[in-house]
Amino acid sequence: MKKLLKSVLVFAALSSASSLQALPVGNPAEPSLMIDGILWEGFGGDPCDPCTTWCDAISMRMGYYGDFVFDRVLKTDVNKEFQMGDKPTSTTGNATAPTTLTARENPAYGRHMQDAEMFTNAACMALNIWDRFDVFCTLGASSGYLKGNSASFNLVGLFGDNENQSTVKTNSVPNMSLDQSVVELYTDTAFSWSVGARAALWECGCATLGASFQYAQSKPKVEELNVLCNAAEFTINKPKGYVGQEFPLALIAGTDAATGTKDASIDYHEWQASLALSYRLNMFTPYIGVKWSRASFDADTIRIAQPKSATAIFDTTTLNPTIAGAGDVKASAEGQLGDTMQIVSLQLNKMKSRKSCGIAVGTTIVDADKYAVTVETRLIDERAAHVNAQFRF
């Protein structure tokens, strides 16, 4: 049985290096791996000894914490209906732009994100009790990247407007949902933190069964937003938008004169509980574990308008291409705006974990009972890699 357990854990630890996958599980035996310190010797006494003090029971560890999520499995968390203008029904020509909101099927409902990445570099500190329990925290910086179909971001615009003017009316609302495009965003590097606890619950020889619980938070701002759409392609550096604002947006939305906007930021929260089994083989301690986690990314459903000119230049305010192929702008004529997408905007919808369960595989290398390096990979609910290097005082 021992040989079988050794074989399974060693194979899992070595195979993890070939496939990488925001919170690590960690080695369940970590509280008891480093039993000596670089400044103070470890205490191996009996906790039930009446002569033992808390000074003998407590120790500190510090080190580097790196967590790199290459693909988090996320989906949108939105309502089934979305308020915008009626669908166009005219078979030819243009039509009067809608001015009232209608409840339509939300194209963002249940959408899966194509890519979600997060990279964290931090310092970690752990308070150890009786070489069995850890209470730890991390302080560092995180950055992220999100990519998805434009429908996930409710990219909308107005098409077929029959007005005789260089801009739409103030009460016009979008009537087209653009779902054949891609939206991606990059965040800046922002402060992040996490707290947690880990315990070695059961030990038998060299095997250890342990559990942990963690919580993490960060709130990075959106550094760059790219909309890759044939009908309305644009890029915004440090985008700003409207929170809690229904259609229609002000006509100055997207211009330098826009007011009432705020910076786009993403509030990231995650909690995780895990259970893992390890087996010590001299200086190597491979482990395998399962985890249950929930993550959310909330941007307050901020709506961001396409950048445009405050005043018309050559009778246009954006560089959106013609769609039906008119080829020119007919000034002072009906339908001069009908062949281009107008009042384009998108919103950053709330996202959450699409899968709650995952597995983690890793190994820890211990040197002189004072230093340790842990390498871990996580799969199923995310593809991530974790590196942890620490020492005991």
UniProtKB/Swiss-Prot annotation:
It comes from the Bacteria. In elementary bodies (EBs, the infectious stage, which is able to survive outside the host cell) provides the structural integrity of the outer envelope through disulfide cross-links with the small cysteine-rich protein and the large cysteine-rich periplasmic protein. It has been described in publications as the Sarkosyl-insoluble COMC (Chlamydia outer membrane complex), and serves as the functional equivalent of peptidoglycan. One of its GO terms (molecular function) is porin activity. The gene is ompA. Belongs to the chlamydial porin (CP) (TC 1.B.2) family. Pfam families: Chlam_OMP (PF01308). Keywords: Cell outer membrane, Cell shape, Disulfide bond, Ion transport, Membrane, Porin, Signal, Transmembrane, Transmembrane beta strand, Transport. Part of a disulfide cross-linked outer membrane complex (COMC) composed of the major outer membrane porin (MOMP), the small cysteine-rich protein (OmcA) and the large cysteine-rich periplasmic protein (OmcB). It comes from Chlamydia trachomatis. It is found in: Cell outer membrane. The keyword ATP-binding does not apply. Residues 1-22 form the signal peptide. GO terms for cellular component: cell outer membrane; pore complex. One of its GO terms (biological process) is monoatomic ion transport. It is a multi-pass membrane protein. This is Major outer membrane porin, serovar E. Its main location: membrane. The keyword Repeat does not apply.
